[in-house]
């Protein structure tokens, strides 16, 4: 299952389910807003993801509300993210946004959002293809 939504409550529910059921092929996708470099996308455990405010909130809530481990221990939730810093839009662009974590405040680049999705899909396909049983 691929979680590619931007709603924290939904992400939390899916990630909690994946951890508790030990889902073999679950991955959550971080925020692509404000990112410009598709080649910097990575897949790791959420415990080591950086530069992603949405995943940081998810990680914090998994720890606080659902007992996920601290101290650098893996949380058993794979994620797609980029260590690239979020870039605010140029002031000359006159972008109107609500300032939330959705892309409307920062904008998004299709090459980055597509790469996030393709990486998530490829990861799930590889997990399914390499599994002896599901």
Q: Model-derived features: where do they sit?
A:
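Short, contiguous strand/loop micro-motifs
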Residues: 1-2, 108
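ADP-ribose/adenylate-binding Rossmann-like module
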Residues: 2-49
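Glycine-rich phosphate/adenylate-binding loop
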Residues: 7-10, 36, 40, 48-134
